Amino acid sequence: MNSLEQAEDLKAFERRLTEYIHCLQPATGRWRMLLIVVSVCTATGAWNWLIDPETQKVSFFTSLWNHPFFTISCITLIGLFFAGIHKRVVAPSIIAARCRTVLAEYNMSCDDTGKLILKPRPHVQ
Amino acid sequence: MMRTQCLLGLRTFVAFAAKLWSFFIYLLRRQIRTVIQYQTVRYDILPLSPVSRNRLSQVKRKILVLDLDETLIHSHHDGVLRPTVRPGTPPDFILKVVIDKHPVRFFVHKRPHVDFFLEVVSQWYELVVFTASMEIYGSAVADKLDNSRSILKRRYYRQHCTLELGSYIKDLSVVHSDLSSIVILDNSPGAYRSHPDNAIPIKSWFSDPSDTALLNLLPMLDALRFTADVRSVLSRNLHQHRLW
């Protein structure tokens, strides 16, 4: 195995890593958008719910019933967290971190875009 | 008389309630596992760029050799006094195997994400099972993992290993003569002692339900299939094998 072939192999290896992380971006962007929209809905809903003078007079469940917008967006937000949205919004960095864990064994690392970092072979003591 | 009957009734009720409670806990534990697995970011198959597709057509399809015990699964049999898994953890399946004319029950726990892992890597590699356990047990486990998907057809067992200094060494040339396109995934460094440049080490797994070692490997395995010689990457191994 000559060094030219090895370099070629490492390049192809790196290409797939960067390509994969790049491909993840649109989906991650959509998840982030969704999280922002639902969070903003929940926040506005909560504000309206809290400033409503009725909320303090009636029971908790009745007040929730009076503010369906808040109730629904809050349930959606909880559902999203159960489905792991907090991990999906950082998926590319999770994948990059996994790469780093495995590549460390091979004296390499990678940045958040998947670019390889080759480390010099340590001297045997 | 009345008192004894009352006590007896109460005792039956308590016993029944305890059974119901443990059943409930059992169900809950299963559900928690499902939720954890679902929450984790997995590894979706994403399309190849034209350059990568072209590259893939130029290189050979690789073989991935997989170990079973403590890599893909963990099992203990009913004779063990202190099982390594937390008591009460339900096994994924139970195997009944006859060894030396004695029927033995093996409680097998699948490593988290193993089904997903096998499904994904089977699209990239030709999978081969190579285990140091006995054929009768190894083939039953492989059948269960395969789940009639026909992805684990080639299998090698203890009789295909070479015994050296009390440990079983897996000779990859038995599986395939061309070492440029074969990779072995094993938790024990001793198993691939004769082919260190073809090895991917993995931490031994016993019971941790939040383990993601198999998912961690997916980006690396995805990228590795584009190399002409897997040793270009794998020979950079420092072999700082910790005793896992």
From Swiss-Prot, chain A:
Q: PANTHER family from the entry? A: NUCLEAR ENVELOPE PHOSPHATASE-REGULATORY SUBUNIT 1
Q: What is the protein's known function?
A: Forms with the serine/threonine protein phosphatase CTDNEP1 an active complex which dephosphorylates and may activate LPIN1 and LPIN2. LPIN1 and LPIN2 are phosphatidate phosphatases that catalyze the conversion of phosphatidic acid to diacylglycerol and control the metabolism of fatty acids at different levels. May indirectly modulate the lipid composition of nuclear and/or endoplasmic reticulum membranes and be required for proper nuclear membrane morphology and/or dynamics. May also indirectly regulate the production of lipid droplets and triacylglycerol.
Question: What protein does this entry describe?
Answer: Nuclear envelope phosphatase-regulatory subunit 1
User: What does the record give as the organism's lineage?
Assistant: Eukaryota, Metazoa, Chordata, Craniata, Vertebrata
The compartments listed are:
Nucleus membrane; Cytoplasm
- UniProt keyword terms in alphabetical order: Acetylation, Cytoplasm, Lipid metabolism, Membrane, Nucleus, Transmembrane, Transmembrane helix
The UniProt entry lists the main location of this chain as nucleus
Mind telling me which GO cellular component terms the entry cites? cytoplasm; cytosol; Nem1-Spo7 phosphatase complex; nuclear envelope; nuclear membrane
Q: Its family?
A: Belongs to the CNEP1R1 family.
Biological process according to GO: lipid metabolic process; positive regulation of triglyceride biosynthetic process; protein localization to nucleus
Which Pfam families does this UniProt record tie to the protein? Answer: Tmemb_18A
UniProtKB/Swiss-Prot annotation, chain B:
Question: Can you quote a single GO CC term?
Answer: nuclear membrane
Enzyme Commission (EC) number: 3.1.3.16
- Which key words are in the record? Endoplasmic reticulum, Hydrolase, Membrane, Nucleus, Protein phosphatase, Transmembrane, Transmembrane helix
Stated membrane topology is: Single-pass membrane protein
Its catalytic activity? Answer: O-phospho-L-seryl-[protein] + H2O = L-seryl-[protein] + phosphate; O-phospho-L-threonyl-[protein] + H2O = L-threonyl-[protein] + phosphate
Q: What GO terms in the biological process aspect are recorded for it? A: canonical Wnt signaling pathway; gamete generation; mesoderm development; nuclear envelope organization; positive regulation of canonical Wnt signaling pathway; positive regulation of triglyceride biosynthetic process; protein localization to nucleus
Q: Where does the UniProt annotation locate this protein?
A: Endoplasmic reticulum membrane; Nucleus membrane
Highest taxon listed in the record's lineage: Eukaryota
Leading EC class: hydrolase
- Please give the start and end residues of each transmembrane region: 7-29
Q: Does the keyword Magnesium apply?
A: no
Q: Known InterPro entries for this protein?
A: Dullard_phosphatase, FCP1_dom, HAD-like_sf, HAD_sf, TIM50
- Name the Gene Ontology molecular function terms of this record: phosphoprotein phosphatase activity; protein serine/threonine phosphatase activity
CDD domains in alphabetical order: HAD_FCP1-like
Boundaries of every FCP1 homology domain copy: 57-224
One Pfam family per UniProt = NIF
What subunit structure does UniProt give?
Interacts with CNEP1R1; the complex dephosphorylates LPIN1 and LPIN2.
* Role summary: Serine/threonine protein phosphatase forming with CNEP1R1 an active phosphatase complex that dephosphorylates and may activate LPIN1 and LPIN2. LPIN1 and LPIN2 are phosphatidate phosphatases that catalyze the conversion of phosphatidic acid to diacylglycerol and control the metabolism of fatty acids at different levels. May indirectly modulate the lipid composition of nuclear and/or endoplasmic reticulum membranes and be required for proper nuclear membrane morphology and/or dynamics. May also indirectly regulate the production of lipid droplets and triacylglycerol.
Q: What family is reported?
A: Belongs to the dullard family.
For this entry, the protein name equals CTD nuclear envelope phosphatase 1
Q: What is the lineage of its organism?
A: Eukaryota, Metazoa, Chordata, Craniata, Vertebrata
